């Protein structure tokens, strides 16, 4: 057995199965397409489910892939052990009703013994206890020693996940120190002790499990295999853990270099080193697939990984942001198989750095708060942190609850998760595990996706808005029907159509379907998972039946407006690259007949000057009346010509390229104007951030742009009338009014201070003494926080010894301040505790130091009640 690098193993595997007539497909995105059962792709076969279930026709009956995967179900074990990781690559070869056991078993043996040259006396095979067919093939079609084959039960060697396709499996294992194993019991024991490790699972999908629990034989059985690349690399490189594999160790070494720590010298530091090494791999690949840090879904998974890694960097003594620098090592070791990493290198680094900086801004304050909570819990001899406090750390300081749990676990403290989840409300969906579905293999198994794959629905709408066709499918009330009549709503599928189905951010067409005896309104148009065009209709008159001849007619005015907005989106994209920078990449868009929305990568607000320049460029290109051309070409040719591709899309070999003169060239399947001049006019109406590193521009075109400008002009005219000036004088008039208003506000504030000063004497005259401590408390009217603090300072200084607590109702909000002299603090007075109790009554909260604290409240009606509690609280604190 010769040592092989991880990248070499991957290439040898894919090449081997290409030689067996398999189509090599690139890894799919980590973001699942048309699969609500998963947050992230977590297995090699996951993106291929539509092929296994018959919802889509595979590009070839034999396929091989190396799929990037992320699993976070056992993230708490990552780092603590050297076996667990969140990111891994799964090599696989798949048969969709083509070859079966008699082919894959000899191929598997050939690959591991002749290509990888694994010693046969180190290999073991397991089969399902009843699978005599597999045993016969292993014994008679390979030269494996029959004594090294063991039958195991359903738990070990039968693959199923809920209902649907399932079947027995055969696993291949490597001996890592078990010695000779003679029985299945000895084999299981050695496996549990990691002395024998499984590295390849051959799944024979030959049954379909129904709701009654019956296993029905499939007419066309499938093959689904999975070999973990990193695990295979540990065997081929004779290392004990994935962290010692060549490409991963390169990252680990960089972590050690940045931190000054040495691996395998300190158990606690080793945990942090492994966590960072693993997480940066997941982080890099997730961002390359368009995922951005957020507080929900897969974005939350990313944020959790990133902040967990950043926190462990601080544990290692790394003071500055550092994760973005590790990305280079990940990319250098992976880009040949994942070229998108190199293409998006700078973007990935910017997203990571921005999120690190945001976490840096809050982590120190958050850790201080958490340490205070830990002390409080321990001082009270408790073992649980309340859910509301854990939520405050999450909401205010950006601490993922799992990070808080991890830190608390080190202190022997847990979280009140029920209380935390109650606080979370709308953010209940966590990243601990993917959403569960009963039917794993058929998560999109709706009636719309059961349309016969042999029915073709050709789109003719690029150059036609009206076509004749026949009705191929009718669906009503989630059932296939022979017909529909007036008043019914459902779905009609025809053999050809001019209707554009919603896709690529462009809304679906509307219009009518009719003949002499019926008429239906098309209210929406979408595609099912296999690409069939679905016309969502309401029958206005008559009846329609299968195979009826019909005419399909698109709403022309609406389609034309959509075309204008879609072409304008392309020009906008090119203009943004020109003005803002070539780092700009589309991360989403939405185009309908009213407006367009364009999301793009950028790390700060686009300035007013930049927006003006972008708008100017777009309108200039519109006025040039450039020809808009479309051409179908090879994907590589399109890229060579500089055509822009969407961030995370997978494209076929032949793609449609849309060009607007020499200014814009993009891969696009949408509908467009034939000449940029048809857009007429372009106007940006808003620019805002929608996520970390993502900005959004909304704009209108043609008559909608004119309406927008008219509306703005009318506002100017009305404002000029109110201020009794003409429009040219409006700015000067407004500036004058603002200056006057500021002067009046200063006068008002001065009067309020006078009133507050007048209240000072009254408060000093009403000082009470509690357990030897002077207490001054009062509610004062309508003064802001600064004035309230000034008044508190004066009263405290005047008292020389004591505590003062003041509250104010200012513009509908309640403000509190508490101050104490040093001698009263020594007696037990704590302003932070006083203010917290008092503010709670007014629906607020806050805290602070023993000698000074402030807070806010939500209910002005409770201000007097809150102030009345001051004496009771002080009495409870004074020793």
Swiss-Prot record:
SUPFAM superfamilies given in the database record: Class II aaRS and biotin synthetases (SSF55681), Putative anticodon-binding domain of alanyl-tRNA synthetase (AlaRS) (SSF101353), ThrRS/AlaRS common domain (SSF55186), Translation proteins (SSF50447)
A GO molecular-function descriptor: alanine-tRNA ligase activity
First-tier enzyme category under EC: ligase
Subcellular location: Cytoplasm
Catalytic activity: tRNA(Ala) + L-alanine + ATP = L-alanyl-tRNA(Ala) + AMP + diphosphate
GO CC annotation: cytosol
GO biological process, one term: alanyl-tRNA aminoacylation
Record's keyword annotation contains Ligase: yes
Keyword Protease listed: no
The protein's required cofactors: Zn(2+)
Residues given in the record as Zn(2+) binding sites: 566, 570, 668, 672
Matches recorded under Pfam families: DHHA1, tRNA-synt_2c, tRNA_SAD
E.C. number: 6.1.1.7
Cofactor annotation comment: Binds 1 zinc ion per subunit.
PROSITE patterns: AA_TRNA_LIGASE_II_ALA (PS50860)
Keywords of the record: Aminoacyl-tRNA synthetase, ATP-binding, Cytoplasm, Ligase, Metal-binding, Nucleotide-binding, Protein biosynthesis, RNA-binding, tRNA-binding, Zinc
Top-level lineage group: Bacteria
Domain observations: Consists of three domains; the N-terminal catalytic domain, the editing domain and the C-terminal C-Ala domain. The editing domain removes incorrectly charged amino acids, while the C-Ala domain, along with tRNA(Ala), serves as a bridge to cooperatively bring together the editing and aminoacylation centers thus stimulating deacylation of misacylated tRNAs.
UniProt cross-references to HAMAP family, sorted A to Z: Ala_tRNA_synth_B
NCBIfam families found in the cross-reference section: alaS
Biological function: Catalyzes the attachment of alanine to tRNA(Ala) in a two-step reaction: alanine is first activated by ATP to form Ala-AMP and then transferred to the acceptor end of tRNA(Ala). Also edits incorrectly charged Ser-tRNA(Ala) and Gly-tRNA(Ala) via its editing domain.
Family designation: Belongs to the class-II aminoacyl-tRNA synthetase family.
Alphabetical list of PANTHER family matching this protein: ALANINE--TRNA LIGASE, CYTOPLASMIC, ALANYL-TRNA SYNTHETASE
UniProt protein name: Alanine--tRNA ligase
Gene: alaS
């Amino acid at each position: 057995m010769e040592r092989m690098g991880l990248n070499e193993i991957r290439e040898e595997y894919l090449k081997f199965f290409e030689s067996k007539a398999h189509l090599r497909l690139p890894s799919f995105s980590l973001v699942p397409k048309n699969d609500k059962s998963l947050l992230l792709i977590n297995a090699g076969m996951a993106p291929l489910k539509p092929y296994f279930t018959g919802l889509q026709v595979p590009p070839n009956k034999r396929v091989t892939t190396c799929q990037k995967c992320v699993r976070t179900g056992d993230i708490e074990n990552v780092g603590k052990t050297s076996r667990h990781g969140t990111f891994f690559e799964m090599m696989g070869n798949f048969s969709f009703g083509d070859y079966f056991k008699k082919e894959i078993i000899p191929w598997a043996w050939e690959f591991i013994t002749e290509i990888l040259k694994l010693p046969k006396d180190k290999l073991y095979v397991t089969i399902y206890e009843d699978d005599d067919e597999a045993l016969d093939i292993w014994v008679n079609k390979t030269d494996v020693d029959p004594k090294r084959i063991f039958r195991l039960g359903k738990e070990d060697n039968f693959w199923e996940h809920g209902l649907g396709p399932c079947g027995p499996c055969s696993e291949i294992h490597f001996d890592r120190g078990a010695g000779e194993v003679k029985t299945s019991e000895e084999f299981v024991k050695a496996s549990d002790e990691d002395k024998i490790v499984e590295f390849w699972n051959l799944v024979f999908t030959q049954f379909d499990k129904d709701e009654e629990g019956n296993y029905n034989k499939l007419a066309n059985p499938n093959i689904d295999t999975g070999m973990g690349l990193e695990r295979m690399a540990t065997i081929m490189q004779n290392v004990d853990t994935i962290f010692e594999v060549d490409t991963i160790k390169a990252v680990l070494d960089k972590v050690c270099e940045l931190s000054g720590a040495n691996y395998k010298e300190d158990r606690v530091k080793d945990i942090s080193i492994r966590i960072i090494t693993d997480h940066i791999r997941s982080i890099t690949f997730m961002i390359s697939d368009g995922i951005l840090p957020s507080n929900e879904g897969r974005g939350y998974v990313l944020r959790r990984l990133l902040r967990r890694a950043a926190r462990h960097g601080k544990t290692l003594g790394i003071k500055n942001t550092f994760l973005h620098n590790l990305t280079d090592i990940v990319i250098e070791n992976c880009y040949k198989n994942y070229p998108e990493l190199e293409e998006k290198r700078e973007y990935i680094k910017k997203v990571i750095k921005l999120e690190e900086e945001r976490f840096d801004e809050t982590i120190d304050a958050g850790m201080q708060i958490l340490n205070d909570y830990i002390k409080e819990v321990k001082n009270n001899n408790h073992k649980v942190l309340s859910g509301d406090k854990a939520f405050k750390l999450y909401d205010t300081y950006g601490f993922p609850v799992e990070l808080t749990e991890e830190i608390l676990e080190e202190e022997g403290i847990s979280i009140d998760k029920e209380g935390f989840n109650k606080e979370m409300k709308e953010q209940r969906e966590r990243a601990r595990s993917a959403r569960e579905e009963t039917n794993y293999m058929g998560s999109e198994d709706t009636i719309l996706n059961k349309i016969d794959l042999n029915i073709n629905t050709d789109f003719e709408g690029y150059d036609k808005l009206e076509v004749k066709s026949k009705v191929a499918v009718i669906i009503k009330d989630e059932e296939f029907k022979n017909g529909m009549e007036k008043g019914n709503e459902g779905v009609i599928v025809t053999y050809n159509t001019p209707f554009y189905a919603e896709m690529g951010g462009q809304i679906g067409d509307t219009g009518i379907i009719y003949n002499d005896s019926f008429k239906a309104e098309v209210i929406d148009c979408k595609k099912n998972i296999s690409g069939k065009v679905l016309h969502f209709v309401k029958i206005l008159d008559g009846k329609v039946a299968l195979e009826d001849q019909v005419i399909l007619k698109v709403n022309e005015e609406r389609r034309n407006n959509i075309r204008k907005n879609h072409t304008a989106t392309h020009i906008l994209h090119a203009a943004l690259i020109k003005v803002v920078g070539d780092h700009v990449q589309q991360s989403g868009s939405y185009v309908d007949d009213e407006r367009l929305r364009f999301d793009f990568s950028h790390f700060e607000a686009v300035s007013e000057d930049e927006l003006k320049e972008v708008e100017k460029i777009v309108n200039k290109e519109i006025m040039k009346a450039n020809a808009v051309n479309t051409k179908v070409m090879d994907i590589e040719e399109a890229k060579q010509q500089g055509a822009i591709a969407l961030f995370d899309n997978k494209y076929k070999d032949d793609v449609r390229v849309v060009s607007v003169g020499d200014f814009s060239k993009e891969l696009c399947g949408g509908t467009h104007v034939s000449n940029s001049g048809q857009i007429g006019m372009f106007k940006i109406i808003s620019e805002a951030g929608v996520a970390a590193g993502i900005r959004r521009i909304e704009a209108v075109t043609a008559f909608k742009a004119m309406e927008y400008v008219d509306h703005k002009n009318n506002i100017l005219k009305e404002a000029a009338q109110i201020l009794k000036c003409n429009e040219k004088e409006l700015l000067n008039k407004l500036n004058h009014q603002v200056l006057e208003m500021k002067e009046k506000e200063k006068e008002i504030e001065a009067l309020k201070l006078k009133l507050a000063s007048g209240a000072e004497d009254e408060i000093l005259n009403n000082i009470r003494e509690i357990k030897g401590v002077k207490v001054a408390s009062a509610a004062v009217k309508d003064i802001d926080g600064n004035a309230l603090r000034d008044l508190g300072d004066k009263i405290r200084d005047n008292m020389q010894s004591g505590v003062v607590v003041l509250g104010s109702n200012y513009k509908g909000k309640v403000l509190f301040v508490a101050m104490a002299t040093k001698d009263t603090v020594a007696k037990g007075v704590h302003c932070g505790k006083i203010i917290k109790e008092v503010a709670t009554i007014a629906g607020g909260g806050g805290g602070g130091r023993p000698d000074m604290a402030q807070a806010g409240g939500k209910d002005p009606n409770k201000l007097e009640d809150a102030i009345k509690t001051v004496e009771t609280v002080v009495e409870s604190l004074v020793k």
